[in-house]
Amino acid sequence: MKRVVYPGTFDPITNGHIDLVQRASKLFDSVVIAVAASNRKGPLFTLEERVSLAQKALSHLSNIEVCGFDCLLKDLVEEKQAYGVVRGLRAVSDFEYEFQLANMNRALAPSMESLFLTPAEHLSYISSSLVKEIASLGGDVSKFVPKLVQSALTDKYNELKA
């Protein structure tokens, strides 16, 4: 069985992430969506909230698992008995960073493969950072995230303003 891990902060999960998971789920028997704690990044949502949002947003897919993690990615890939990781490349600017990560992961775990998927063109400009910025200023993010994520963003920013 070919299983891959799709790691990310998913703060929050976007339609771009969901598109990548849907396509990966057709290519592999199983996809583990690994939500990184990423405390250094200072995420808006807690790890538990991000895991929950991802689980709900991806509940229509039967061959996926969502989990949080706070360890080396190579250790999670080993634990999940995965073939490697899948990552999205939105633009050339993503490539340099992802190439560096892939090489570092290969140095740490020589058998771990890094696979890259490009997004659907109409989703290529979406990023969690931009979505959060738009939402924080009261903008409409309905084209970029599922309704449940849009509601969670509204609630979170209202909570922060209170």
Curated annotation (Swiss-Prot):
Keyword Nucleotidyltransferase found: yes
Any one Gene Ontology cellular component term annotated for this protein: cytoplasm
CDD domains named in the record: PPAT
Binding site for ATP: T9, F10, H17, G88, L89, R90, E98, L123, S124, Y125, I126, S127, S128, S129
Summary of the function given for this chain in its UniProt record: Reversibly transfers an adenylyl group from ATP to 4'-phosphopantetheine, yielding dephospho-CoA (dPCoA) and pyrophosphate.
Keywords from the UniProt entry: ATP-binding, Coenzyme A biosynthesis, Cytoplasm, Magnesium, Nucleotide-binding, Nucleotidyltransferase, Transferase
Catalytic reactions of this protein: (R)-4'-phosphopantetheine + ATP + H(+) = 3'-dephospho-CoA + diphosphate
Entry's Gene Ontology BP terms: coenzyme A biosynthetic process
EC number in record: 2.7.7.3
Residues with site note (Transition state stabilizer): H17
An example Gene Ontology molecular-function term: ATP binding
Pathway listed: Cofactor biosynthesis; coenzyme A biosynthesis; CoA from (R)-pantothenate: step 4/5
Family recorded in the similarity comment: Belongs to the bacterial CoaD family.
Gene3D superfamilies from the UniProt entry: HUPs
Cofactor requirement: Mg(2+)
Binding partners and assembly: Homohexamer.
Keyword Magnesium: yes
Cellular location(s): Cytoplasm
Matching SUPFAM superfamilies: Nucleotidylyl transferase
Lineage: Bacteria, Pseudomonadati, Pseudomonadota, Gammaproteobacteria, Cellvibrionales
Name of this protein: Phosphopantetheine adenylyltransferase
Name of a matching Pfam family: CTP_transf_like
Biological source species: Teredinibacter turnerae (strain ATCC 39867 / T7901)
PANTHER family attached to this UniProt entry: PHOSPHOPANTETHEINE ADENYLYLTRANSFERASE (PTHR21342:SF1)
Binding site for substrate: T9, K41, L73, R87
Domain of life: Bacteria
